[in-house]
Amino acid sequence: MPHRKKILLSDSNEALSMLLADSLRERGNFHVFHAKDEDETTKALHRHRPHVLLLDFLLPHKGGFHVMQHLREDGYKISTIFMTALPTHRVIEEAYRLSASFVLPKPFTARALVERIHDALRSDRP
C-alpha cells in the first residue's frame, strides 16, 4: 500500500470534522488528524508534520488568519487549504496574502475537498 499523506483538519465543528475525516480516509486514503482551536492546531502541526493543513476561518479565539500569520512568522511551510463560510473578497484576498494554497468556500463536497488536497500536494507552493 502506498504511503498515506497526512492531513491536519483544523475546525471547531466536531461533527463536521468527523464526517470530513471519514470521507477523506475513504476517498483519498489520507491519514487525518483533527484540531479544534489555534493551540491544538499549532501543537498538532509540530507533532504530526502533516503534508496539508485544512484550516477553518472561524476557529475559536483568534481565528484562522491568526494561525496562518503565526505560521508565516515562524517560517513554517505547509500547503494550506483555507475553508470559509464567508468567502468575501476581503477574506479570500487575505488568505492568499498569508500564503494559502487554496480557498474553499463552504459548503463544499467531499469530492471537491479531495481534489483541492491533491492539487495542494502537487503544487510547488507550500
Residue locations for each model-derived region?
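Two-component/phosphorelay signaling modules centered on CheY-like receiver
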Residues: 14-33
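Acidic catalytic/metal-coordinating carboxylates
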Residues: 37, 63-66
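Active-site beta3 strand of CheY-like receiver
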Residues: 48-54, 59
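Short amphipathic alpha-helix used as the core "switch/output" element in two-component signaling
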Residues: 65-76
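Alpha4 helix (beta4-alpha4-beta5 surface) of REC/receiver domains from two-component response regulators
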Residues: 66, 87-102
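C-terminal output helix
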Residues: 108-118
